[in-house]
């Protein structure tokens, strides 16, 4: 049975690596194989195929509704409100369960996320809303580094996103018991300094936690404590078990399950709490039936049941972090008779390191020590005090306030120590991309040395480690980063870099420096920007200038706009050499302007190949450039002016540049329709790429010219460009 469960889990998990979403034809083929496999009693292969078939059928079924969106961007929907989270005072993020799309029912009812930038009336969870919204399939930025936005959305079960245009009707739902309880607790803890943290620990309401606090928790490794997760549900379940022992084994099981269910309900049945509750349910069923199963069998059953309950859970980082952490604990118990707390923490630190690097591209080196001290404080004092306070809040306000005050005092101590540590030390260490394979190989070698059956891995592991450390010659690379509707171009060689433009920043604090540029620089091991070029002052080009200047050293700044006294003004005729490349400023003729036509146009050449960065220049500047440069504008690759607007890319300019490759830096399904179809037609003799559709572009020199690799041309199905959700018989590039 255990190998069958493991086979099912492996089959289901393989969906993370599929290059495309298989069609029903593949499902039919798998079904036809099940009968002979069952006849031959090859159960491992049978359950492996069952896992694959389960994911294929479920993903195709749950994503099929996206076909109905078509090319239309505005839709009328009726949906049930799941949550409304304010992002500061800028907008409200609505989580909606859609029942009708354009007045037609939707099955199964999908989960979508809609941003509302206008004022909304107070709405209760469960209210039915009819609204008009832009709507597009789940999408995220696609770069070598930074969060995978699409996988993040799918991991939460969200399959489409949009912006609210207008509300047609709201049918308010009665205020639920959770909202009444939350209101009573909020009144009790309102005067306290750390009320938002108490709301997060008890009800999973995280909107009041600041970005600085999240950064602090990430650096200290305490994010898993603040965000309600399996650890919290397990703690409450254990508390219920302890209290229920007075009523015998089955009384303890019922009390434990009841406590876990109530806490999950308080947290709004968030995805992480649902997973933990199912694990508690699996364990409870086994204990109720008095089955004495080993821990790893319970682990396998929980994995399979969760996959059956919510196939999208496999795309959640929290799912893998929690299950891998439990697997490591089981392994420690197998290798050590009585492991100490420090041994457990060390194994968790090392075992989770590759996954943490893959997901977050950095480590918190002090996390083990901080967790050794903080976790007992939270589990023994802060969380129990806060939860008992919540239970008492509706009836005994003063007593609840006293308990909240004690929990708040503990939170104050923790934050004081963490802030002091953050002032003295760098808590979060972003690491270059090569750390991931290196740490994975080292961990594999260490594990093989510790566990006798795995020692055959030592030799191949050492050989792979040698290859990973073997130095390779550095050559220049150019990346047009996927920054949505904006521009950011990174030119690098080894650990040296020049950055051209910085992308946009948005209401609520989200910005392309923290989301894309800084992770990309860290991934490449770049710690200093040799030259920062800001083409002009528009926010989608210069929006993150201050953030970058504060985040890392910049040796020289060049711009067409005088941002500060340290900014060198960009002017035609400027030239310099850098790492074997020649840079020439072709425009503007007169510095100091801030309009599109004043943008800093730069031509980069290695003597054989050339790239033209054309900012947001339009017809007037293009005409003058053609007159000044003529055939000198000819370039191998062009980053199109003004994101592909029809006010730019005039036929004379297109003919003069005569690029073989053209990259349009434009957001996915942007409101301006960039690049415009007529502009795309003007470049019909060149290969064209759009960052919003195909992700970041990696440009490298080759003997034949320049190679362009799109981020969405590689990787699993959910990272692909085009209609990634559509099942296919075969992979289509």
Give, region by region, the residue ranges found by the protein language model.
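Hydrophobic alpha-helical segments of integral membrane proteins
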Residues: 15, 19, 32, 36, 174-189, 197, 205, 213, ...
């Amino acid at each position: 049975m255990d190998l069958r469960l493991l086979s099912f889990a492996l089959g289901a998990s393989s969906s993370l690596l599929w290059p495309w979403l298989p069609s029903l034809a593949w499902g039919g083929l798998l079904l036809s194989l099940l009968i002979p496999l069952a006849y031959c009693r090859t159960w491992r292969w049978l359950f492996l195929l069952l896992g694959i078939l389960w994911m294929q059928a479920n993903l195709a079924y749950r994503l099929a509704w996206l076909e109905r969106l078509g090319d239309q961007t505005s839709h009328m929907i009726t949906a049930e409100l799941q949550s409304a989270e304010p992002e500061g005072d800028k907008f409200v993020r609505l989580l909606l369960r859609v029942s009708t799309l354009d007045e037609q029912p939707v099955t199964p009812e999908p989960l979508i996320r809609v941003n509302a930038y206008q004022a909304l009336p107070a709405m209760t969870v469960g209210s039915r809303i009819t609204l008009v919204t832009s709507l597009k399939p789940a999408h995220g930025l696609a770069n070598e580094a930074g969060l995978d936005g699409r996988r993040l959305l799918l991991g939460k079960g969200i399959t489409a996103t949009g912006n609210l245009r207008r509300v047609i009707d709201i049918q308010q739902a009665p205020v639920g018991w959770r909202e009444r309880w939350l209101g009573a607790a909020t009144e009790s803890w309102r005067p306290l300094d750390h009320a938002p943290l108490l709301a997060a620990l008890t009800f999973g309401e995280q909107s009041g936690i600041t970005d600085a606090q999240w950064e602090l928790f990430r650096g200290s490794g305490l994010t898993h404590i603040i965000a309600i997760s399996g650890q919290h549900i397990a703690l409450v379940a254990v508390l219920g078990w302890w209290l229920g022992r007075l009523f015998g084994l089955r009384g303890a099981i019922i009390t434990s399950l009841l406590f876990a269910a109530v806490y999950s309900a308080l947290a709004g049945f968030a995805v992480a709490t649902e997973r933990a509750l199912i694990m508690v349910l699996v364990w409870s069923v086994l204990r109720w039936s008095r089955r004495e199963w080993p821990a790893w069998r319970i682990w396998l059953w929980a994995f399979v049941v969760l996959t059956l309950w919510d196939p999208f859970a496999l795309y959640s980082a929290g799912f893998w972090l929690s299950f891998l952490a439990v697997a490591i604990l089981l392994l420690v118990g197998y290798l050590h008779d009585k492991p100490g707390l420090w041994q457990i923490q060390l194994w968790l630190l090392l075992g989770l390191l590759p996954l943490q690097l893959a997901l977050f591209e950095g480590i918190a080196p002090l996390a083990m020590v901080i967790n050794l001290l903080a976790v007992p404080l939270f589990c023994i004092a802060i969380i129990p005090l806060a939860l008992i306070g919540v239970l008492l809040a509706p009836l005994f306000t003063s007593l609840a306030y006293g308990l909240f005050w004690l929990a708040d005092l503990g939170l104050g101590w923790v934050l004081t120590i963490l802030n002091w540590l953050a002032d003295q030390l760098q808590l979060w260490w972003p690491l270059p991309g090569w750390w991931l394979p290196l740490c994975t190989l080292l961990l594999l070698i260490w594990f093989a040395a510790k566990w006798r059956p795995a020692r055959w891995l030592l030799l191949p592991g050492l050989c792979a480690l040698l290859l990973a450390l073997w130095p390779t010659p550095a050559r220049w690379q150019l990346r047009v980063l996927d920054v949505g509707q904006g521009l950011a171009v990174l030119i690098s060689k080894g650990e040296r870099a020049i950055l051209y433009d910085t992308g946009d920043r948005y209401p609520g604090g989200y910005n392309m420096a923290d989301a894309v540029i800084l992770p990309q620089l860290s991934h490449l091991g770049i710690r200093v920007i040799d030259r920062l070029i800001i083409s002009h002052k528009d926010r989608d080009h210069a929006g993150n200038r201050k953030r970058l200047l504060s985040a890392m050293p910049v040796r020289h700044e060049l711009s067409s706009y005088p941002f500060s006294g340290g900014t060198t003004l960009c002017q035609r005729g400027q030239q310099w050499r850098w790492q074997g490349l020649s840079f020439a400023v072709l425009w503007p003729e007169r510095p100091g302007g801030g309009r599109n036509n004043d943008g800093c146009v730069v031509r980069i050449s290695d003597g054989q190949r050339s790239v033209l960065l054309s900012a947001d220049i339009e017809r007037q500047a293009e005409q003058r450039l053609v007159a000044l440069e003529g055939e000198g504008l000819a370039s191998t690759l062009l980053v199109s002016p003004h994101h592909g607007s029809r006010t730019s890319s005039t036929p004379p300019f297109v003919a003069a540049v005569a690029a073989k490759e053209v990259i349009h830096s434009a957001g996915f399904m942007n409101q301006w329709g960039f690049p415009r179809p007529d502009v795309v037609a003007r470049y019909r003799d060149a290969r064209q790429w759009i960052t919003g559709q195909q992700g970041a572009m990696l440009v490298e020199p080759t003997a034949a010219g320049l190679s362009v690799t799109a981020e969405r041309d590689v990787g699993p199905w959910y990272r692909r460009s085009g209609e990634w959700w559509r099942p296919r018989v075969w992979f289509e590039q």
